[in-house]
A protein has these predicted regions:
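N-terminal/domain-start segments enriched in small and hydrophobic, helix-friendly residues
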Residues: 27, 35-39, 118-131
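Single conserved hydrophobic/aromatic residue that forms the stacking wall/gate
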Residues: 182-194
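Catalytic cores of alpha/beta
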Residues: 77-85, 120-126, 164-177
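Glycine-enriched alpha-helix->loop->beta-strand junction motifs that scaffold or abut catalytic
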Residues: 38, 63, 85-91, 107-112, ...
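Active-site-adjacent beta->alpha loops and helix N-cap segments on the catalytic face
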Residues: 46-61, 78, 93-106, 113, ...
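Hydrophobic faces of well-ordered beta-strands that scaffold small-molecule active sites
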Residues: 15-17, 42-44, 69-71, 91-92, ...
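Generic structural signal for hydrophobic
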Residues: 30-34, 58, 83, 104, ...
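Conserved N-terminal beta1-alpha1 strand-loop-helix module at the mouth
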Residues: 1-77, 82-86
Length: 194
């Protein structure tokens, strides 16, 4: 799928479910349930054991393009390449990495790095990030979107961390292109169950 088509589908959806799970089977069930509930954007994190194989299985299962499947918690270009080869449509990371940006640009795959300051947002945009992930969003609240869009009206942003059903409308009103929402189990719940 073309990079432009992926970005359009993600922004049309407006919501991306962040899937963390204890195992591959659980991750697939959560992803299927999100899609069945109408959420076509899925970010499968590389904290899931065998995440590359889960991405490959979901990419094959939904090869019709019904699911916009991304890889999350991508910390380096090696992991990004693994995810892209497995079938990920986009790459999300908790922080900006210049080499990951280069790799994603080479393959024309959208890269959405986590940024917490306007300097980080500018650096990511200059490196070709199409959408910047505001993370951790709960430290700032929706007001940060207005603050960043003041000097950077062209910035395309999506928040994660602290975005939930009670405040997602506030983020959308603030001008984000999409929101990332965590599915269950939370990272804390996952640690407890081990």
């Amino acid at each position: 799928m073309l990079k432009e088509d992926v970005l359009k589908k993600l922004t049309d959806c407006g919501l991306v479910a962040v899937v963390r799970a204890n195992n591959a089977e659980e991750a697939i069930k959560i992803s299927d349930a999100c899609l069945a509930g109408g959420c076509t954007g899925i970010e499968l994190t590389f904290t899931v054991p065998g995440a590359d194989k889960v991405i490959a299985a979901l990419a094959e299962k939904y090869s019709n393009g019904e699911m916009m499947l991304g890889a999350g918690t991508v910390l380096d270009p090696e992991t990004a390449r693994m995810a892209i080869l497995a079938g990920a449509n986009f790459i999300v990371s908790p922080a900006f990495n210049a080499e990951t940006a280069k790799l994603c640009n080479r393959y024309r795959v959208p890269y959405m790095p986590g940024c917490a300051t306007i300097t980080e947002v500018i650096t990511a945009m200059e490196a070709g990030a199409d959408i910047v992930k505001i993370f951790p969003a709960d430290l700032y609240g929706p007001k940060i979107i207005k603050d960043i869009k003041g000097p950077l009206p062209q910035a395309q942003m999506m928040p994660t961390g602290g975005v939930d059903k009670d405040n997602v409308a506030d983020w959308i009103k603030a001008g984000v292109v999409a929101c990332l929402l965590y599915t269950s189990p939370s990272p804390r719940d996952m640690r407890r169950s081990r």
